[in-house]
Amino acid sequence: MIEADRLVHAQPQGTEERDEQIDRAMRPKLLDEYTGQDDTRAQLKVFIEAAQKRGEALDHMLIYGPPGLGKTTLAMIVANEMGVNIKSTSGPVLEKAGDLAALLTNLEAGDVLFIDEIHRLSPVVEEILYPAMEDYQLDIMIGEGPAARSIKLELPPFTLIGATTRAGALTSPLRARFGIPLRLEFYNVKDLSSIVTRSAKVLELPIDQEGAVEVARRSRGTPRIANRLLRRVRDYAEVKHDGEVNKVVAESALDMLDVDVEGFDYMDRKLLLAIIDKFMGGPVGLDNLAAAIGEERETIEDVLEPFLIQQGFIQRTPRGRIATARAYQHFNLIQPE
């Protein structure tokens, strides 16, 4: 199964224009509208207020954590709270030094430059970024060959917000230049059900508390997945029921979508059962596991494993992955002694 085809995968999907408009409407615009991540929210309020009192640009910020938890949304909120513009790009898009220079030279004082997947910056672009972050200077080469010369351009104070799902993949010099590191965690059911309720209002979808909790419970602690499942539950409710969502309707819709009570789909169950059945519960090395389920190492490490480990279904050990007692219980299997 291709990762992008999964309802419960947390990467953004290519959607039609109307879905993109709905996604934008679902996003909170200010910190007071942002649900969950209480520690991060409290820290940001202090940092933003302090920067505003001093009349300075906010310090550079690194937001990291699993996909779908609101890194892009948080960057937009920071820009809104600071009352500045935001320019967005991603690491793979910035292929040449000139690509980054074009963005930096168009920033105004205090603006936010948001770079998603910042761990994928090329070394050439990263080298240009260091003096820009530290000294608000841009070192660029003019001309080629013997006639080439370096010139320095002064940049207005700006805030770089980098987002990544793989903080460990950042180089040490780049990571050290971020004054504000923020880790986003998976959401609990209570906070996620509040997000579902808010999104349902945007969709003009009647949903009761139990229905919202059921959607939240199967959303893998991830707002992006919750909003995607909510749209599919809405489709089911409009066709099979009277358009309203309660616990029974949500359960029926999500069962039809093959998303179980833990938020697992076919790929999650395939991974867990491979460890249990093919490798006797583990330990199993990542390469063997990837070959057994026909997936890439990176997909297992970055997409499948984080939630399964966080929820206690898989344990990582020096010798490999192990299925926990909770994994056996999920499939009503007896764990070997």
UniProtKB/Swiss-Prot annotation:
The UniProt entry, under Pfam families, shows: AAA_lid_4, RuvB_C, RuvB_N
Entries under SUPFAM superfamilies matching the protein = P-loop containing nucleoside triphosphate hydrolases, Winged helix' DNA-binding domain
What UniProt keywords apply to this chain's record, in alphabetical order?
ATP-binding, Cytoplasm, DNA damage, DNA recombination, DNA repair, DNA-binding, Hydrolase, Nucleotide-binding
Main localization category: cytoplasm
Reaction(s) the record says it catalyses: ATP + H2O = ADP + phosphate + H(+)
Give the matching PANTHER family: HOLLIDAY JUNCTION BRANCH MIGRATION COMPLEX SUBUNIT RUVB, PTHR42848
- Residues covered by region (Small ATPAse domain (RuvB-S)): 188-258
Matching entries from SMART domains are given as: AAA
Description of its domains: Has 3 domains, the large (RuvB-L) and small ATPase (RuvB-S) domains and the C-terminal head (RuvB-H) domain. The head domain binds DNA, while the ATPase domains jointly bind ATP, ADP or are empty depending on the state of the subunit in the translocation cycle. During a single DNA translocation step the structure of each domain remains the same, but their relative positions change.
Q: Which organism is it from?
A: Shewanella loihica (strain ATCC BAA-1088 / PV-4)
Record flagged with keyword Acetylation: no
* Binding positions for DNA per the UniProt entry: 297, 316, 321
Q: What is this protein called?
A: Holliday junction branch migration complex subunit RuvB
Tell me yes or no: is Transcription regulation among this UniProt entry's keywords. Answer: no
Q: Which CDD domains match?
A: AAA
Q: Where is this chain's protein located in or outside the cell? A: Cytoplasm
Q: Which residues bind ATP?
A: 27, 68, 71-73, 134-136, 177, 187, 224
Please provide one cellular component term from the Gene Ontology annotations of this protein: Holliday junction resolvase complex
Subunit details for this protein? Homohexamer. Forms an RuvA(8)-RuvB(12)-Holliday junction (HJ) complex. HJ DNA is sandwiched between 2 RuvA tetramers; dsDNA enters through RuvA and exits via RuvB. An RuvB hexamer assembles on each DNA strand where it exits the tetramer. Each RuvB hexamer is contacted by two RuvA subunits (via domain III) on 2 adjacent RuvB subunits; this complex drives branch migration. In the full resolvosome a probable DNA-RuvA(4)-RuvB(12)-RuvC(2) complex forms which resolves the HJ.
According to its UniProt record, which protein family does this protein belong to?
Belongs to the RuvB family.
Region named Disordered: 1-27
Could you say which EC number(s) this protein's record lists?
A: 3.6.4.-
Question: GO biological process: any one?
Answer: DNA recombination
| Annotated region described as Head domain (RuvB-H), given as residue ranges | 261-337
Which segments carry the region annotation Large ATPase domain (RuvB-L)?
A: 4-187
